[in-house]
């Protein structure tokens, strides 16, 4: 049963500007494992924007605002085939448990200008 749906779209250029302005941007919003993934992919802003959009989509699927958790409470990882999956921590995990959410499916894509992600909580 679907318990929540979230979608987010972001301009890749917005993330590129944030990376230029604040060198600690990635450290503040993304986990160590997520940052390792960015390095492996060459640190392209489109990849970073996709993961950011995924985090936003998950927040919406959980039905809460980000004020109830930290960005690092939502981790976007990839399996051995490269498929993204969500791992929740701390408050995000507690919120999911309280709503009887067992899994969050995620899809991420981007064009030249935008990154988009959709999350479905079950």
Swiss-Prot record:
Any one GO molecular function term: holo-[acyl-carrier-protein] synthase activity
Disulfide bonds: none
EC number: 2.7.8.7
Keywords: Cytoplasm, Fatty acid biosynthesis, Fatty acid metabolism, Lipid biosynthesis, Lipid metabolism, Magnesium, Metal-binding, Transferase
A Pfam entry, by short name: ACPS
Enzyme class (EC, first level): transferase
Cofactor(s) recorded in Swiss-Prot or TrEMBL: Mg(2+)
Predominant location: cytoplasm
Extent of the signal sequence: none
Gene3D superfamilies for the chain: 4'-phosphopantetheinyl transferase domain
Compartments, as annotated in UniProt: Cytoplasm
GO cellular component: cytoplasm
Record's catalysed reaction(s): apo-[ACP] + CoA = holo-[ACP] + adenosine 3',5'-bisphosphate + H(+)
UniProt KW Transferase keyword: yes
Binding-site positions, Mg(2+): 8, 56
GO biological process, one term: fatty acid biosynthetic process
Described purpose of this protein according to its UniProt entry: Transfers the 4'-phosphopantetheine moiety from coenzyme A to a Ser of acyl-carrier-protein.
Family membership noted in the UniProt record: Belongs to the P-Pant transferase superfamily. AcpS family.
NCBIfam families in UniProt: acpS (TIGR00516), pantethn_trn (TIGR00556)
Official protein name in the record: Holo-[acyl-carrier-protein] synthase
Organism whose genome encodes this protein: Alkaliphilus metalliredigens (strain QYMF)
UniProt gene name: acpS
């Amino acid at each position: 049963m679907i318990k929540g749906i979230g979608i987010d779209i972001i301009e890749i250029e917005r993330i590129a500007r944030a990376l230029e302005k604040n060198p600690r941007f990635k450290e503040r919003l993304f986990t160590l494992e997520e940052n390792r993934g960015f390095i492996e992919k060459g640190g392209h802003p489109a990849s970073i924007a996709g993961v950011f959009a995924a985090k936003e989509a998950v927040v919406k699927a959980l039905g809460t605002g980000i004020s109830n958790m930290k960005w690092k409470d939502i981790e976007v990882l990839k399996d051995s085939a490269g498929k993204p999956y969500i791992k929740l921590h701390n408050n995000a995990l507690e919120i999911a448990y309280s709503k009887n959410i067992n899994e969050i499916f995620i899809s991420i894509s981007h064009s030249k200008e935008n990154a988009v992600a959709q999350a479905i909580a079950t």
